Amino acid sequence: MFVFMIDEKLLAYLEAYLTEKRKTTFKNVLEHRTRHFTVVLEDIYQPHNASAVVRTCDIFGVQDVYSIENKYSNTVSRHVAKGSQKWLNQYRYREDGNNTQICLDALKEKGYQIIATTPHNESCLLQDFDISKKTAFILGAEAEGVSDIVKSQADGFLKIPMVGFTESLNISVAAAIILQSVTTKLRSSKIDWQLSTKEKEILYFDWVKKTIKNVDKIEERYFNNL
């Protein structure tokens, strides 16, 4: 098993390029990050919708976003995402025609239950959803919804209560409603939902590097002076 080791001296060297405010912000945000929940986007046609979901995940502290790209390429719009993509781990499944299955298998291997967001007859209402298990929320294409593969392998179905004439929500709006509800419950629960110390250290190191302009040259200078 690969173990990522952080060069503490290099980190200290790089931290000198950051303000105290930025370092404090990183540490505060990390305290609210979680992998207890994750979001999976399956064949989202409109890139701006996918980008808005990425931004929503950052806002509510969900660290990982998965993208299944059987039909459409999911390119994040920087204008819509507002830079949030920089702070998240994004996993794209686009190499094989069976990307949905490969992604679902990877999620199950990581211990996630698969929850399809769809107005299914057996769907659980959002307010009644049990947050105790690690959950991957699958959001499907704007028109078709989640695929049959997802429906057949889902551990459950989730729907947002609606009482109007319209029976669907924009995918980014749906993601925001779901994540606001489940993360609020999560943070007031006794569930061990936070990242491990090692996970926080790895992300902090990554964020520090992403913040510094020409970081590769700065690292090179550091190693040349050893």
Regions found by a protein language model. Give the residues of each.
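Short, Lys/Arg-enriched N-terminal segments with co-localized hydrophobic residues
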Residues: 1-4
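RNA substrate-binding interface of SAM-dependent RNA methyltransferases
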Residues: 16-122, 183-184, 191, 195, ...
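Structural alpha-helical scaffold elements that stabilize or flank donor/cofactor-binding regions
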Residues: 53, 130-131, 150
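Short beta->alpha connector loops at strand-helix junctions that form conserved
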Residues: 68-69, 94, 141, 158-165
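Short, glycine/polar-rich helix-capping loops at beta-to-alpha or helix-loop-helix junctions
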Residues: 73-78, 144-150
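Short, hinge-like loop/turn segments at secondary-structure boundaries
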Residues: 81-86, 132-135, 177
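Structured adenosyl-cofactor binding patch, chiefly the S-adenosyl-L-methionine
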Residues: 151-196
